[in-house]
Design a protein with these regions (language model features):
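Long, aromatic- and glycine/proline-rich binding clefts that accommodate carbohydrate-like moieties
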Residues: 69-71, 83, 387-397, 409, ...
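Hinge/lid segment of periplasmic solute-binding proteins
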Residues: 43-78, 145-205, 389-395, 566-589
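Periplasmic solute-binding protein
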Residues: 145-165, 181-228, 240, 263-312, ...
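Extracytoplasmic "Venus flytrap"/periplasmic binding protein-like
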Residues: 103-180, 215-217, 221-223, 354, ...
């Protein structure tokens, strides 16, 4: 294996591979991630001992790793030669699974695994096709837990906790340890039934250039203009002030044009997720309460006793409320005034590569799944030692946000199995899924994507030792904040269909002649129409039943969401980084 760079920070070096590249991080522990075990025949069977040696970073000791791997080898005997095909979205973690873990599992067990990678929109379409048609297309999906509202209603997804206790009792890893999964609550219904098993999760956080913010000259100029410190913004007004400052007051650093804000806005499906991934929640559209706000939760949908009753303000929803209009207007205003022109050609998957070029001061909506790209040897946002020049912090909040509301978004891509898949295929895929999330494997997988899923990994000394190299990600996952940065909730009854409406309407707003208010009124009406149609379809539970239409003031004058318009401008508030991390451990609930 070629190592493209070796830069020890504390005298010892650990290497991670991603996107076909190798980059180095230095820690005080000896950690090493090799490529899959090789032999003269790349498809030759592997022994348990071979595989144990591969996963040397595991939280388990050698004896415990051997025991897990022996169990997989034995449990797979009845399925040897079975071919299974699974699919997931395109992020570094899943590329690691597809390129390495699938092959190792095949060589260990004899189950032939094909792990496909595709774009998130395509993944959703394929899942929806199998769900709607009943045809067998894939044996397993790594599907966002944002779909939990769909899965609990349709009855088309295997309820994992029921199967683990019954049909799959003999093929469920004894050391699977469900309670060790940090995102397991995201995949349950109100009764505690588990529908999906987390495979990876990543948070949406605030990202900023700590080196630029620490520049004494910049600090002095910012304070002179705005009357408070250049530091980590706590609200949207401070974020906007900082964006204005770097875009127009600083303008250039080392002869290169720089920008105070960064975003992505290409007119394609990921544009919808840019808003639907809790952007409205950060503005303060929701009600108080966790995980998503009660009774008004994500997407401004009101649900009463789990029954969706409306998205429009006239039905008690908040999708077209003053807070939602404010959120959408800020997105467009910042994009057009403070972001580089290239932003409008970028997507969820391409944005991180641009950010790594080093021309941006901050990003309010940054996905931690792309840490590997920012740490790549070609990145311009690391120093000569490979340490990040950036830091992560809690997301700034809009002027409607109140203590007790949801604080941010977290994606939890989770193993999902459909009843329409033949039993043998489903069972073999279940074995592979458990391998990818087993304690033997997960820490090495973490090092190849930085999307942790287990308490035992994030609380380990090895993860703690990575603090300096990850710019705040360790602090986030070791704090209570990981529990309140939540995915979309159960209020959303048909995620795939309704998600498609988002990007089409947001695209029209960005690139057409329509206001934020008009956009959200149209979208809220579409949501209500769709939920009305769903009410005629038999569902297992929580079928929509829309409220009667009332005058908007009826709901706006009631306590809670939808909130009345706030005319007053926020005063910008910032905090030094040393104080920011404390916020992740206090008052998060």
């Amino acid at each position: 294996m070629k190592l493209r760079r070796s830069v020890p920070i504390h005298g010892l070096t650990q290497f991670c591979s991603t996107k076909g590249r190798i980059f180095a991080l230095g820690f005080s522990l000896v950690l090493f991630v090799p490529t899959p075990v090789s032999s003269s025949n790349s498809d030759a069977p592997l022994t348990v001992n071979d595989v144990t040696k591969h996963f040397i970073n595991s939280s388990l000791n050698v004896t415990e790793r051997n025991a897990e791997l022996e169990w997989f080898k034995e449990a797979a005997k009845a399925y040897k030669g079975t071919k299974v095909t699974v699919i997931s979205e395109d992020i570094p973690t899943h590329r690691y699974e597809s390129q390495y873990l699938a092959k190792i599992f095949t060589q260990l067990t004899g189950i032939q695994v094909s792990h496909e990678i595709t774009g998130e929109d395509d993944l959703v379409k394929r899942l929806q096709l199998q769900m709607n048609s009943g045809l067998h297309i894939y044996d397993g999906y790594i599907n966002d837990s944002d779909f939990i509202g769909t899965h609990i209603r349709t009855g088309k997804v295997v309820p994992l906790s029921d199967f683990i206790e019954n049909e799959w009792r003999d093929i469920t890893l004894p050391t699977l340890d469900i309670d060790d999964f940090i995102g397991i609550e995201f995949t349950k219904n109100a009764q505690g039934t588990i529908y999906q098993l987390p495979d990876q999760q990543f948070a949406n956080l605030y990202w900023y250039r700590h080196d630029w913010f620490s520049n004494p000259d910049f600090q002095k100029k910012f304070h002179a203009k705005y009357g408070y410190e250049l530091a980590v913004p706590q609200n949207w007004q401070a974020y906007e002030d900082i964006a204005q400052f770097f875009t127009y007051d600083i303008q250039e650093i080392d002869g290169e044009r720089i920008w105070g804000h960064f975003d992505y806005a290409k007119y394609e499906p990921s544009l919808g997720w840019r808003i639907s991934d809790s952007w409205l929640s950060l503005a303060g559209v929701n009600d108080l309460g966790l995980p998503s706000g009660l009774p008004v939760g994500d997407w401004g949908i009101r649900a009463e006793e789990c029954i969706p009753v409306g998205a429009s303000v006239t039905r008690g929803g908040a999708l077209n409320s003053p807070a939602a209009i404010y959120a959408l207007e800020k997105y467009k205003f910042w994009l057009e005034n403070y972001a580089p022109p290239e932003s409008k050609s970028l997507t969820f998957r391409t944005a991180a590569q641009f950010l790594s070029q080093g021309r941006v001061a901050q990003q309010i909506f940054w996905y931690s799944a792309f840490v590997p790209i920012l740490l790549d040897e070609d990145s311009k946002v690391i120093d000569e030692n490979g340490d990040p020049l950036w830091r992560l912090a809690p997301s700034p909040r809009g002027k409607y946000w109140k203590q007790g509301m949801k604080s941010g978004y977290q994606d939890a891509g989770s193993w999902t199995f459909l009843h329409s898949t033949p039993d043998r295929q489903k069972e073999a895929a279940w074995l592979y899924a458990q391998f990818t999330v087993s304690k033997t494997v997960t820490f090495d997988k973490l090092l190849n994507g930085f999307t942790p899923i287990r308490h035992s990994d994030i609380q380990s000394p090895a993860f703690t030792a990575m603090q300096k190299g990850l710019g705040g990600l360790v602090e986030f996952y070791q704090s209570d904040a990981k529990n309140v940065w939540t995915p979309s909730g159960v209020n959303i009854p048909d995620y795939s269909t309704m998600a498609a409406m988002w990007w089409q309407h947001i695209g029209e707003y960005l690139y057409g002649d329509i206001t934020a208010k008009e956009t959200l009124f149209k979208l809220a009406s579409k949501f209500d129409q769709h939920m009305q149609s769903l009410s005629a379809i038999p569902m297992r539970q929580c079928s929509p039943k829309l409220n009667m239409i009332s005058d908007p003031t009826v709901w706006l004058n009631k306590p809670g969401a939808p909130w009345k318009e706030i005319v007053e401008k926020q005063q910008g508030v910032t905090l030094p980084l040393s104080e920011v991390y404390k916020l992740w451990n206090i008052d998060v609930r």
